[in-house]
Curated annotation (Swiss-Prot):
Keyword Transport: no
A single GO cellular-component term on record: plant-type cell wall
Keyword Disulfide bond belongs to the record: yes
Principal subcellular localization: secreted
Function as written in the Swiss-Prot or TrEMBL entry: Probable flavin-dependent oxidoreductase.
Organism of this sequence: Arabidopsis thaliana (Mouse-ear cress)
Cross-link (6-(S-cysteinyl)-8alpha-(pros-histidyl)-FAD (His-Cys)): H134-C196
Cofactor note: Binds 1 FAD per subunit in a bicovalent manner.
Glycosylation positions in this chain: N76, N161, N280, N364, N419, N463
Signal peptide residues on this chain, from the entry's feature table: 1-16
Descriptive protein name: Berberine bridge enzyme-like 6
EC number per UniProt: 1.1.1.-, 1.-.-.-
Amino acid sequence: MKEAFVFLLCLTNKFPKKFNSCSKKKETLYVLGLVLLVSFIEAPVTKPNFGKFIECLRDRTTPENPITDVISIADNSTTFLSSYVSYTKNKRFSSPNFKKLLAIIAAKHVSHVQATVVCAKSNGIQLRIRSGGHDNEGFSYMSSVPFVILDMHNLRSIDVNLSRKNAWVQAGATLGELYVKINEASQTLAFPAGVCPTVGAGGHISGGGFGNLMRKFGITVDHVIDAQIIDVNGKLLNRAAMGEDLFWAIRGGGSSFGVILSWKINLVEVPKILTVFKVNKTLEQGGTDILYKWQLVANKLPDSLFITAWPRTVNGPKPGERTVAVVFYAQFLGPTDKLMEIMDQSFPELGLGREDCHEMSWLNTTLFWANYPAGTPKSILLDRPPTNSVSFKSKSDFVKKPIPKKGLEKLWKTMFKFNSSVSLQFNPYGGVMDRIPATATAFPHRKGNLFKVQYSTMWFDANATESSLAMMNELFEVAEPYVSSNPREAFFNFRDIDIGSNPSGETNVDEAKIYGSKYFLGNLKRLMDVKAKYDPDNFFKNEQSIPPVRVK
């Protein structure tokens, strides 16, 4: 980049005062060069040297914390494949790219993380950072240039401070582990995060993780009060050392700024007894009408009540027929009696009965939301399944005004065309989400949204991949008239390569602005500026990372 700039300066110095045809060619060359310089941000080119990378790792760690036993060299061995697949949660990406993936570093100590960052950078090797492996597009463990995976799953400690009602959680800990640890300390403390217990805390929190407590308490990043991060120079920084601009960026801006080691989070107070319910309404039972009414009330209900709607395709009432069942899941921070009062007054169309309601502790609600049957032991939240046999694709949208019934019917018609399992998830906004400024953290999707949509499809047969992805694009296109626009907003934690991406080894700023404006809205400029300050050579990058661009 520096050499290109010097070259451009040389051209300008050679321009004569009076332009002739030759000088005009030079002027054109200058302009083209300047455009390329501004449009592409690349790290200084260093030819990848894996041998020196390994040597560097050994030199930068101590005998007390040796790194050699956490290095898995990429080969076709059972050991390496197990290391790769164990935290590859999307079967679409379960086959490693042996031509580009050089090794997996499953760090067990902070020095392993520091050494991996410094040695990868100095030896021209790209770094991908993986905690739980739930990246929808595989960006945390896939690349088309020589790279290593820094796997954080061994760094999973959780320290709850009951008196201060906060906790330190390392990036490799799962949400299930965090929930159990909190419950061991107190039955009336909780953390507002997601429903999948195997998701890693590192990526979930850094992308602005949401969950069923969001209307009452907000999302994960609203409760982060400190963090530990390894920067591009291998330095360990906390909030005080990194500064407020970087601390702001990592709360919702993802992994473009460094490697998150741990988060310090505030815990929230919940009652001893919560109430949950699950009610199904098929199209034949008036599901479309009830869902339309849900759009009118879900974001206006008391903050303590969260009702999400999941339309999905199921077998119809007759053999060979298919229909849509809208599944309403809910959680109320209180007893059944109070919940029934609210529902009878605000949403009687659902026809909720007392027999549908179940009172339980907060920890047991996490089992309910993870679709475990009643009576499942809490210890299952600590499980880390070694493989995932399902391929999936997700997309997201934000809805500002109710989708008309005709629009919903168009969605159902398109869903029937899928050969694979397909569902939508409507998560309501309102409550405290309307009261937190869009600029409070890097996560911008706040006031003005009725609900967020997640589109999901899953399949087992690898031969169904192409058709499943094509159908998702068709469904997304059908939904376009009914969702946000200019830009069409997207949720960063639901990575979607279709909304814009860059090649693995370079970052086109114009392309980055396309996907970046959808994920981060007006916060993108500030994020690019922070990136330019802390990672000017763009070392921490992937197909949808934030480019380093100084913004005046």
